[in-house]
A protein has these predicted regions:
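Conserved short alpha-helical segments that host acidic/polar catalytic motifs at enzyme active sites
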Residues: 1-171
Length: 171
């Protein structure tokens, strides 16, 4: 299990993102991550291992690097290191997911047979969030890509996508 949080503000969103993501800490104990966007800084991301420490103690010392960003997503995950920052024909975006994909191995094999690759590994397995992101970028738009995910995935998948224009939520 895990939890995700997203926020957009007219001023810095860092405090809201930090506390909103931390609120989900009871849902996962493996990894925590945040990604923000601003025109000045672009995408800023941080991921920490939470297996031996709490979200707050890991992220609090480095919150200043996110300062000035007005949109962001955060995740507490019991599986994958995330959010991931991608660059594709859809533009740059950050993505985090909470999912239980029953046909993960099948989808992975299909992607590999089409000469796709996976750059992120989690405990020796393909990163689920990267698999979802690769299905999204198969679409001509984010909407088509998200529909592609739900057309192929057996199981559940909730996602937040941080773009240069805002946040897309899908479940």
């Amino acid at each position: 299990m895990g939890g995700i949080f997203g926020t957009i503000s007219k001023k810095s969103c860092v405090a809201d993102l930090f506390y909103g993501t931390d609120y989900n800490s009871h849902l996962g104990t493996r990894r925590g991550g945040m990604a923000t966007y601003s025109e000045d800084k672009g995408f800023v991301r941080s991921i920490h291992n939470l297996e031996s420490s709490y979200f707050r103690s890991k992220f609090e010392p480095s919150l200043n690097k996110f300062e000035g960003c007005c949109s962001g997503i955060g995740v507490i995950s019991d599986t994958d290191a995330q959010p991931l920052v991608m660059n594709s024909h859809l533009g740059q975006f950050a993505i985090c997911t909470v999912s239980k994909i029953a046909n993960m191995e099948q989808l992975e094999a299909e992607m590999l047979s089409r000469n796709m690759h996976f750059a992120e590994m989690s405990s020796g397995k393909t990163n689920t969030t990267e698999l979802v992101a690769l299905h999204i970028i198969q679409g001509k738009t984010f909407r088509e890509g998200i529909e592609n995910v739900y057309h192929h995935v057996k199981g559940s998948c909730t996602m937040l996508i941080l773009t240069t224009d805002g946040i897309i939520c899908a479940r």
